């Protein structure tokens, strides 16, 4: 039986790079993958997954209303799919995570999701929370804080590098808006003890 995977980390750990490498590995063995990414993350262009290393690929774009299982099954009718790869999985709805689990459980298609656990305020994203609860396999990718400790948090900063302590859960951005840090330094920046 296929599995549902969730690879998670703080920002800037190389999740998209890893996803693109997995796609390459499947295709190198003449297997077919379906790459998917949320429409709201258009930093690399709509329907595109890109890494900070400069590599990228086109992907199927979806919204929080898209029935992901239906999309995958429709594409499977055109060509077999050996693996589904989801970038920015924190933006999945709870229902979409369950849809992806049905692809693994019913359709026997491995689904690999890549995303961050928590937002800039330390709260779990709904999609990440469900993935952490039901994924068959959890994989933590590691990156480091400026102090050298493992970074587990993503700090949102303004143009001057000051921590933003409140705001919308979702604010698309990269290295210019987010800094990965350990919990201790995240708490200090957020004014918490």
Curated annotation (Swiss-Prot):
Pfam families: TK. The active site is at 88 (proton acceptor). It catalyses: thymidine + ATP = dTMP + ADP + H(+). Zn(2+) binds at residues 145, 147, 182, 185. It is an enzyme of class 2 (transferase). InterPro entries: P-loop_NTPase (IPR027417), Thymidine_kinase (IPR001267), Thymidine_kinase_CS (IPR020633). ATP binds at residues 9-16, 87-90. Keywords: ATP-binding, Cytoplasm, DNA synthesis, Kinase, Metal-binding, Nucleotide-binding, Transferase, Zinc. Homotetramer. Belongs to the thymidine kinase family. This is Thymidine kinase. It comes from Idiomarina loihiensis (strain ATCC BAA-735 / DSM 15497 / L2-TR). The gene is tdk.
